[in-house]
A protein has these predicted regions:
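Macrodomain-like recognition of ADP-ribose-binding/processing modules
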Residues: 1-252
Length: 252
């Protein structure tokens, strides 16, 4: 295949949108305004099924997303104070826990946690604001492909396999500044909050932390698991997250 000559981010964006349109039966002939290109690129990535694509596309996509990550601003752990430094907390392990509000896809740490769904393929809703969509969009289409390969192996044993609530799956991070993505499926609150749902959420945190140890992940950033689309009450979820992390540190 002839090598594509790309000079800058603008040309990369043109190429990626064009190739993603070609790759889509439904949208192969759409006309894209210059101002809408980045939104269209993300949307086409979101709806794309996990199928093979050219090495040249991946090369251009990877360079584009890595440069975009730099432009967004990469945040290292050294620049995030612990709760002891920030709030003067005197609780146990206050020097090992931080609270940070921001874009998790900017973090240059060992692992970030993704609030996934039971199909494990990311969010297919174009431009959706959920964490699953944000992480997959910034990582690149390779992440969905790896998740698909994981699910394909599981479904060799069980055709109807869905990732269970409270488990954790570790994948590469691809074009994110972190090293790994830890995917966990949180509980869904349909009506009242029950002890089982609380325990399910606790298991999400424990599974992620245990997986981190197994993979040599020494720094981990949790998003707010289940508090968005899955309707877990914010305050209750925060208490579970904090108490579970603290208990884990006591035994490790």
């Amino acid at each position: 295949m002839k090598e594509v000559k790309i000079k800058n981010q603008d040309e990369s964006l043109d190429y990626l949108v064009e190739e993603l349109c070609k790759d889509s039966i439904e949208y192969k002939d759409i006309k894209v305004k210059k101002a809408d290109r980045r939104m269209v690129m993300r949307s086409l990535m979101n709806i794309r099924m996990p199928n093979p694509i050219s090495k040249e596309f991946l090369k251009v996509q990877d360079e584009f997303l890595k440069e975009e990550a730099i432009e967004k601003g990469i945040m290292s752990l050294d620049n995030i104070p612990t709760i002891r430094e920030e709030y003067g907390s005197k609780i146990d392990y206050a020097d090992k826990i931080s609270i940070w509000q921001g874009d998790i896809t900017r973090l240059a740490i060992d692992g970030i946690v993704n609030a996934a769904n039971s199909q494990m393929l990311g969010c297919f809703v174009p431009g959706h604001k959920c964490i699953d969509n944000a992480i997959h969009s910034s990582a690149g289409i390779e992440l969905r492909q790896e998740c698909y390969e994981y699910m394909k192996e599981k479904r060799k044993v069980d055709l109807d396999y869905e990732e269970p609530t409270g488990s954790a799956v570790v994948t590469s991070a691809y074009n994110l500044p972190c090293k790994y993505v830890i995917h966990t499926v949180g509980p869904i609150v349909y009506k009242e909050l029950t002890d089982k749902l609380r325990n399910d959420l606790k298991n999400c945190y424990l599974s992620c932390l245990n997986s981190a140890i197994k993979h040599g992940i020494r720094s981990i950033a949790f998003c707010c698991i289940s508090t968005g689309e899955f309707h877990f009450p914010n305050e209750e979820a925060a208490k579970i997250a904090f108490s579970t992390a603290n208990e884990f540190l006591k035994s490790h």
